Amino acid sequence: MPTKPAVNWKQTLDVSVICPVFNTPPGVLAVAIRSVLSQAGPHEVELILVNDCSTDPATVAALRDAADGDGRVYVVNQDRNTGPARARSVGVASARHEWIGFIDSDDLWPEGKLDQAASVLQEWPDSRWIGGSFATLLSDGTLRPAQRLTAKCPPSQVGRTAQRLCTPESTRVLVGSWHPLGTSLFRRHLITDAGDFDPRLTYGEDWLLCLRISLLAPMDYINAETYVLRRQGASLMRSPRRLSAKAVEGLQAARRDPALRIARRELRWLVYGGYKEVAMNNALNGQKLRGMLFALLALTVDPREVGELLMFLRLLRRNGPALACGLQRYSTAEQLDFSSIKSLE
């Protein structure tokens, strides 16, 4: 786990933590819950578990037991499955505290996360957004740190505990460097002021909200891990829906947003890369015709890249490891294998 920071009791944080839950295995959910409730210090924490109409009786029972076992845990039951965007919004609406944090039901908060944030607030009392880096916990137990955000800051914005990233620099940095929503803590009003989570999006609704928040407030960025992303088992990030246009909807929404025109060049390249990623993974999963379609959509974003389209079409003659190896030249995105799933959406 990331190193626990020095304790600073001079500043406390009252935080409502939102966690959407849909059929999460009880053992996995219990670890996520414990990582939030075990945060040391005098911070007041409430954990809001939004049950997104789970159908697994074991998950439903685990949610009930969590609320019965700790007065800081509240369960909000939805009568239909709405997806993480709407579930998070419901959680925020139910929150009591000024600061809002997030965790996915299969991820972790590292030890000392709130202590780190409290130290930032001690140095920057006007802080409205406290962010940080993350690490990925692999299935073999290996913890892989992510690349940290880097941005040019004047000396006045570099503090002892964090550096203050302001727009447009912060917006452009966030466009090109995805960080999980759970790395950040927000003052509640920022979420509302930025328009809340877009319930129409399956992917990228959290990233899009952070981009919009970056236009409203600086991010006080801690150069340390404030979140642990688990790559174990099934999740939306490893769903066959990653092979559909839904995987690019959030990117397209950002590109169409007039307020984000300051990052239009970066967003254009991101959409182009998103279509290439979907094209590649369709080809790897036996959907070569669909892959061709998404490769053509990528070309509509940047018609100058005919050479990359021709390379992709040539690679489609290959199969198996030869195809996977060749496609690494077409897209550097993660290659996903859904061969164990009988039917792809």
How would you label these PLM feature ranges?
Residues 225-233, 238-265, 288-301, 337:
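Catalytic core of nucleotide-sugar-dependent glycosyltransferases
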Residues 100:
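Short aromatic/hydrophobic "clamp" motif used to bind/position activated sugar donors
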Residues 70-71, 86, 114-190:
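Flexible acidic/His/Gly-enriched loops in nucleotide-sugar-dependent glycosyltransferase catalytic domains
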